[in-house]
Amino acid sequence: MTQLTENTDELHSIRLAIDPNLITLPIGSKSTSPHSNSTSDGNPESHNTENEEVDNKAGSLPPEQFSNNSAKLIVNPYEKYGRMSLGQLIPLISQQRGPNFKFADINEDILKQELAIENDNGKQESKDDTKAEDGIDTMDIDQNDNSEANTNDIGYNEWSNEPKEDTGILDNTQDTNINGEMESQLTQEEFNKIRKVMLEHINMAMNESSLAMEFVSLLLSPVRESTAVSSMSPFLKKTVNPGSLNSEKVKMPAVSRRDKLSLSILSRGWKLRALNEARAILKKNFTEISSSLKQEHHYWSSIAYNISNKDVLFKIRDKQTTKRSLGLKYGYEDSGSTFRNDRGTAILRGTDEANGLELIPLTLGRTSTVGSVYKGGKFLRVRIFTKIESEGDYILSGESSLDKLFKNHSENSDSKNDDVRLQISKLKFFIFEQELMHQLKKECAYLISYGVTVENEHKIVIELPNEKFEIEYLSLDDDSVVNHEQDAPKANDRRANLMLVTLRMLLIVIYKKNLRQKMVSNTRKHIASTEKDILLIRPLLGKMRHSNHKKLIRKILKECVLEVVPDTELQERSIQSLDKEDFETFDLQDAHIVKLTKDINAFRNVLDVGKTEFTIDMKQSGKLSLILESPNYCNAQVSIKYDNQTSNTHFNTVSTEFKEVEEFLHFLISTYVNPE
């Protein structure tokens, strides 16, 4: 809205809205003024009669005809585009859109999108102009009347905003198939109608841009008159005097000193609050980082102090704390163990205590603690029972003692305070005892016929003619274990301890055999045999049974030969009968294989099957020899050979029954040696 003031009479000024569409002239008029009742000098008689006649004719015409036959207030040089043919207008539009534009890509949807975007931008600009013009005097013009006049004269719609540059909606990359379908649906009449509407909007946009330029020129005329007049249209120069439109700067209300002080205090308060919050956050983070750094230092120092080069560490995620941690491998898998019920892995978790480390075995689950490892730990115990022949019952004559590692163990002891090395040693002991019991039960499946039975999951019984051995898998908290420390020593305690130590050493021999087999598997074919590979109870049982068999042979020889044939003497010697596959020496350059073989050969006397030769020199009657051996550690086989005085062999037989041996010796002595 603007205010036009005439220089001749400021009191009786005429207020007009600079809208050229409201002021029209007949097409054939020669006058430059569209009004017949107002002039620049305020004298109505200065108008000629020709203009009055034209005005009367224009007032008598209908609105539609008057609108079509009228001339715009601003002489727009671009109005000639409306009279161009389609062949001339389309190249101009293509040139305005850009080099990549194709007129065939235009459709109704794209034009609607452009109009909607321009309408939104126009509304935003109008709001900004309204805010900028606060404080400036405006003319009292009826907005509703003007909007109705604009709508009736120029067909106003949402395209009334100023045209903007190409928004890029008509890009060549649009789908040509959709455009082709839209064009195929338009008829010639619809196309002409759309073209007419488009031209009207183009003309309206150019008129509005010209009007905006006129307004800016008139507003600039008080400051730079020469520059403003050069851009004014001839009609505006004649109708409105330059410098008649002005603008003023509205000053903001001054801020008082009190308000400034209040704002300064408020600003400082917010800054102090932000600084205090930042200080608290930094202090909290510093405390947390310092505590974490201290724990990490303590954790790694404990690992460096307690973990040796022989221990195997690996990365693992703790499922309970969901943090990365270190895992310790305390099992014997790398040493040749084939036990898979417990892989022997634990988590090294840091603590705030003195030792700084805590071992959590993975097999115990999330809720288990280190204390439950030792309280629920189990070990092997060997007990020896001697048979009382008069009563037909057994009496305890020997019991293995608890390992020195647990001598000071009690129910109230706190295992968390143990040294890490001690914890690792205990865990290794428990998993070793567990595997030993597992292997013993597997071996017992093949020794049922020799008096070896599994009474329950934690007890194995070995029965001999005069003795009985019990191998138990007990918990450290068992009452019998606690009370055993107070019992008096028994006769066979040392024997029970030696038997338990031998079982553990034989399990180590199995480990070494497995390692050696892995190393030589590429050059030597091996067929795994469960019955043959597990040698724990059989070597011990074979030694004890062989000893009983020797006593029986001595008794038979004494009754059948020594007491019958005079001047006879019994000689006895042991013969080594080694299994070549077990005690083979490999001619290899690998030092590890050679060392393993030497370690295995150190247990020859234990693993060797029993073989004893009995020789009786009967002088005048010849020589009698018996060889007692145990092919599979448990069975007995007796070879009898008799040579006469000329060293001719008369008999060479083998028997597996001692009754047959006794009968054969009685026959031999009574027939060949002492026929009388």
From Swiss-Prot:
Comp. bias (Acidic residues): 135-145
Biased composition (Polar residues): 146-160
Ranges annotated as biased composition (Low complexity): 29-40
GO biological-process terms attached to the record: cellular response to heat; positive regulation of transcription elongation by RNA polymerase II; positive regulation of transcription initiation by RNA polymerase II
Region of interest: Disordered: 27-68, 117-176
Basic and acidic residues composition bias: residue spans: 47-56, 120-134
Location relative to the cell: Nucleus
Keyword list, A-Z: Activator, Nucleus, Transcription, Transcription regulation
InterPro entries registered for this protein in UniProt: Mediator_Med17
Function description: Component of the Mediator complex, a coactivator involved in the regulated transcription of nearly all RNA polymerase II-dependent genes. Mediator functions as a bridge to convey information from gene-specific regulatory proteins to the basal RNA polymerase II transcription machinery. Mediator is recruited to promoters by direct interactions with regulatory proteins and serves as a scaffold for the assembly of a functional preinitiation complex with RNA polymerase II and the general transcription factors.
UniProt xrefs under PANTHER family: MEDIATOR OF RNA POLYMERASE II TRANSCRIPTION SUBUNIT 17
Family statement drawn from the similarity comment of this UniProt entry: Belongs to the Mediator complex subunit 17 family.
Name by which UniProt lists this protein: Mediator of RNA polymerase II transcription subunit 17
